[in-house]
Amino acid sequence: MDQEMVTKETEKYIELPLLASRGVVVFPHMVIPLLVGREKSIEALEKAMVKDKEIIILSQKDEKIEDPDPEDLYTIGTIAEVKQLVKLPNGMLKVVVEGIKRARIIDFIEIDEYFEVRAEILDQTVPEVDLEMKALMKAVLNKFQEYIKYNRNLPSETIMTVTNIEEPARFSDTIASHLELKFRQEQDLLEAISIKERLNKLLEIIKDEIEILKVEQKIQKKVRKQVEKTQKEYYLREQLKAIKEELDEDEEDDEIEEYRNKAEELDLPEKIREKVDKEIEKLKKTPSMSPEATVIRNYLDCVLDLPWNKVREEKIDLDEAKNVLDSEHYGLEDVKERILEYLAVRKLAPQKKSPILCLIGAPGVGKTSLGRSIARALGRDFVRLSLGGVRDEAEIRGHRRTYIGSRPGRIINAMREAGSKNPVFLLDEVDKMSSDFRGDPAAALLEVLDPEQNNEFTDHYLELPFDLSKVLFVTTANVAYPIPAPLLDRMEVIELPGYTEDEKVEIALRHLIPRILNEHGLTEDEIHFSSNSIYRIIREYTREAGVRNLERKLAAITRKVSKEIVEGRGRQARVTTQSIEKYLGVPKFKYEKAQKKDRVGVATGMAYTQTGGDILDIEVAVVPGKGKLTLTGSLGDVMKESARAALSYIRSKQEELGLSDNFHEEYDLHVHVPKGATPKDGPSAGITIASAIASALTGQPVKGKYAMTGEVTLRGRVLPVGGIKTKIMAARRAGLKDIIMPEENKKDFEEIPVKIKKDIRVNFVNHMDQVLDLILGGDEDEN
């Protein structure tokens, strides 16, 4: 280098033309070719060539900027010497530069068409190589050697070049220039002025790069191995194919032969057989390892597993069927009678289409287990499908085979599982289905449950008609109103009311306790439940229409007795009403007990609930005011309207009741239904509210021995209501034996067990006047 260059290098500051680079960092001692096309950069290079061929290279912060300003450039760059410059035909320059030293920009000087910068030279002093520096250099060198092993793009001679460098600054910059780094990492290394800081950064970067290269190499090895395996299989398969052709062999492999034999054995309908043969031929021509072959196999397995012609032979014996139903279910006489009727018709007319039964009742009343009993009574297979939470139509109809991961719908899968064409098919929780953007499963069920259509039910996956007409469908639901009307119309609804206390006790003694004792390894000699103890469990530890919680409580007692026996604290236990609390703790529930007192403004109604029903006091207070009606007690809209209708009726009877003409302008009425935290709704408290209002306004007490239910109209007509059995059981449990109910509910009363009828006296009414005569005074007309 000439004397002028030496002089300039000894100076602390320097002024040189600026070359802005995009996405490239030039390190000291690094030789790199650059392609230059921007006018300012070309001017700067030409200026440098006129002088001493030196230039300062700064990287742009954003390489997308075409004409960068000083704030768009990093402040630390590299002083470089232009080694070679070639003008290209398109006007661009190809230059080769060698980095010399780092420099920090102090000021920018704009001259004509390019920038000159005033910069401070940073690599002026050579640091002392102490033990820490040597250790760092050795660590970096070792990691760089490991890096070269994984990065095949670098020649092995590179390591020899680096090993011979003793100067720390040049050592670090040379290694940095050979690494495949991100632009930001390169700039960080360039800006690391301290040699030790630079070496530490370099060490961490190389470690990270080695880990990345290891993962990449592992993935490449795995992919290469898989490709080699696939190529090998393809090559061998083609060889095998060629050998068979040379030997003139047309031998089907075992898999194809197996599918053909199975199709022959099943004696499929002609349309189905054509489809199966077509799929078998397609499988034969498809490479066995291809995804398409797997799809065809799954399809053939599904089609050939279905019971196209397999029908379970029925042995219809009404006496045997009755014994089966009675042995597994206590009560439920209406349901049993309907099943026996179906069996009788089935015996006389075997070709008659099966009905669709819909069992509606509270949880735990035996809907699902009744489905199993029906299958056993008929001697058929049983299959259950829960529809709770289903919201995709494809769950019923299946997915088309064009989709990845397609599969048949749950109806076809269940028939495949049943193994026969005429099972008892229980569709559980049909009221829990919902719909979304994927379709409405309830709409898809319309075809399944329609006897006129289900003989050709087509699943999207099968694309073949399947006959469901011989299936006896039984559906279950807790309530009917969520079920769409078209679907409900296709079913014969049978309501399962809640069990009476007597029925629950019988179920416990006949079914629950023997099963629980067997499950817990106990005998009747080791534990005995008295009937009264079961009554107490039902009344004070459960609140339900069914018997699930009763079974849990009985099981809890049995577990505690088992523990006592194992610990040697007893050999047998007798569970009585007094010992219940020892096993189950304090009572959890308390049913409302009737006060039976004659009270002004208080009438007792009967409420229907999913847990067995209860009695409900309606309270009315009359206070001075302007005729305002206040309703409290968490009442629904229907119940509020019922209260307003009751008040209007009482106002229309003001003369008969002896009320003043303007009482409705002088007094406010407050109607309250206790247990305010419990939501209440429905019209069945109409006559109870009207009775309480009449009592409060006239000052005559309501006879406390009566419980009542019925809807009232503005004209005073008493309309029928639902849940009669449950309501009567609630009144009886509360100690009330005198009931007032609508005349039109006589038919419901006839269905109540005789044992309960004997304990109560029912007054059937069709007008509110009759109710007021009964509860407010006069001769009682007891039926």
Curated annotation (Swiss-Prot):
UniProt superkingdom: Bacteria
Functional note: ATP-dependent serine protease that mediates the selective degradation of mutant and abnormal proteins as well as certain short-lived regulatory proteins. Required for cellular homeostasis and for survival from DNA damage and developmental changes induced by stress. Degrades polypeptides processively to yield small peptide fragments that are 5 to 10 amino acids long. Binds to DNA in a double-stranded, site-specific manner.
Cross-referenced PANTHER family: ATP DEPENDENT LON PROTEASE FAMILY MEMBER (PTHR10046)
Catalyzed reactions per annotation: Hydrolysis of proteins in presence of ATP
EC code: 3.4.21.53
Enzyme class: hydrolase
Domain Lon proteolytic: 597-778
NCBIfam families attached to this UniProt entry: lon, PRK10787.1
Residues the record marks as active site: S684, K727
Protein name (database record): Lon protease
Binding site for ATP: G361, A362, P363, G364, V365, G366, K367, T368
An MF annotation (GO) of this entry: ATP-dependent peptidase activity
Localization annotation: Cytoplasm
One GO cellular component, as annotated: cytoplasm
Keyword terms, alphabetized: ATP-binding, Cytoplasm, Hydrolase, Nucleotide-binding, Protease, Serine protease, Stress response
One GO-annotated biological process of the protein: cellular response to heat
Subunit organization: Homohexamer. Organized in a ring with a central cavity.
